[in-house]
Amino acid sequence: MFSLGFVSAILGDHTLEEVFVFASTHGFSCVEIMCWPASNKDARRYAGVCHIDVDQLDMHTIEHIIQLQLKYKVGISALGYYPNPLDDDAEQSKYYIDHIKKVIKACKSLNIPVMNTFVGRDPARDVDFNISRFKEVWPSIIALAEELHIKIGIENCPMLFTRDEWPGGKNLATTPAIWDRLFDILPSKYFGLNYDPSHLIWQRMDEVAPIYHYADRLHHIHLK
């Protein structure tokens, strides 16, 4: 049976404990906690929310987070961080990749099984170019996830809503045809989907078939 939760980004002005209070009060059993860098400069909607600062995750903080879950009887389904690791700016790309790896390590420290993110994309380049970038960037990320036994859930949102995201969007992993190519490159069981059927619906695709076809890759679910 699924546990019902929400993404903590919607409560960006709340403290971590206030997020747990809200979840408990409203009958949720889990929360996906946002872990953007505390010094984050990303300005898009829901970006930049930092409810757990993974750069400051010492033993005292880890114990505090564990106790919050016990106190409010609300678990953490995943840690989330959704940048563009395939950014065409090499320095920015490295910054995103490095922080993704920090969040994966935080999952291990907190005994959280899933880290959710985007594959990323250079919106000005075609799919084949971005596939080649994926081959360069993602093997080391998945190698770390495998080593620490943390599942990576890739959300399938195209991210093409603002001028800077056009024409291709800032997330490559948007359709089953592309998922197949990515899974062929990285067949690891730790590399899967944070599946949101709504993104297939508005792209006029079958949102039900992937639930069956990619059942072993559905590491986390978003619903709208």
Annotate each language-model stretch with its function.
Residues 2-8, 29-33, 76-81, 115-117, ...:
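Hydrophobic faces of well-ordered beta-strands that scaffold small-molecule active sites
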Residues 8-15:
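Short polar catalytic/cofactor-binding loops
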